[in-house]
């Protein structure tokens, strides 16, 4: 069994260093630890809320690391809104999926991206998308490919921690995001 007291995570130009007071164990078998696999009881509302917060924080951390690890010279930040004020996440995700398919068909290549849905106070959905290493595409062309509402695209310049910028859009308190993919 191995132990360690420090951990470093490198995500692009960002380095996270963790130092632990007690040793962290690795290379162990889960079967030895889980000897009492029995029925599990329903979590209390307090525990559910704590678990949601942990899950949300873990997702934001993952988004931050993914973006920082994949950012490139031609990366763009894209915001997609709906003219119809869509509030149904399944419908919005379907429309985004169709946009992605049309966009990849237009470009002739698969795009590398990370997408985060965000809800307004009225429950309307819009998307924040980081497009990694994307060639120049005219705004008008992108607008016609989206065709569901307003778009805004910006080149990512002079930003050291783009992942932190993107992860702040992740909505923690929205009930629609419970048990849903957050990025």
Regions found by a protein language model. Give the residues of each.
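N-terminal extension/subdomain marker
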Residues: 1-51
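Short, charged low-complexity intrinsically disordered segments located at boundaries
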Residues: 17-19, 129-134
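Catalytic residues for metal-mediated phosphoryl-transfer on nucleic acids/nucleotides
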Residues: 33-125, 132-183
